[in-house]
Amino acid sequence: SANGPLSTPRMPEVAGMARFQGESFHTAQWDYGVDLKGKSVGIIGTGASAAQVITSIADEVETLTVFQRSATWALPRDDEPTPPAIVDAFKKGGYSESLRFIDWANGPQPNPDLPFTFETLHDAEANAKLCGAIAKRIKADVNDPDLAELLTPDYPFFCKRVLFIDDYYTTFNKPNVRLINDPEGVIGVTETGVE
């Protein structure tokens, strides 16, 4: 289950929220009664929940405006089907010694284009190398160089939660998706939008 220290949503305190005349809700309290198809949607933030929504609704909304205070590191999930040996090991009774060996033997192979090692956690040079490799990927994924620059974090990898999500950066290439980048963040809500 998702119980624990992160199970209670932290609601933002943005001036004027009560004045907004449109539909609004927090991702932690998703309103399934609101149909977003064909609407102009604004998302405040680029954290984990926002990133999931951004990639999920971009194709169905008329316009999507993302309000970003700081960029986020995001990597594709690179999901693959579960190997048959692991499926068989689970069928035999959970996480066994044989399954641990299969995990170790078939674990993720190093990616030469993504130099992640445990040194990136405590070695500034290794972390900078990893950040450079991911920044290069962002520039390759995002068509507009200025937009790619805005989507590239200016802080070390692992300084904040890293997102593992497919198509995050490429979503910003869509003609209906717009990024508003302001280090001060959203300061208030009006009857018709944000400021």
Labelled PLM ranges:
Residues 121-130, 156-167:
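Short beta-strand to alpha-helix junction loop
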Residues 53-54, 167-168, 191-193:
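Generic recognition of flexible, low-complexity loop/linker segments
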Residues 148, 165, 180:
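Anion-binding catalytic surfaces of enzymes that hydrolyze or transfer phosphate/sulfate esters
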Residues 30-33, 154-156, 176-195:
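A conserved short coil-to-beta-strand element within the FAD-binding core of flavoproteins
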Residues 140-153:
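Short, surface-exposed acidic
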Residues 86-89, 169, 178:
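Short polybasic linear motifs
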Residues 2-136, 140:
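Rossmann-like dinucleotide-binding core of oxidoreductases
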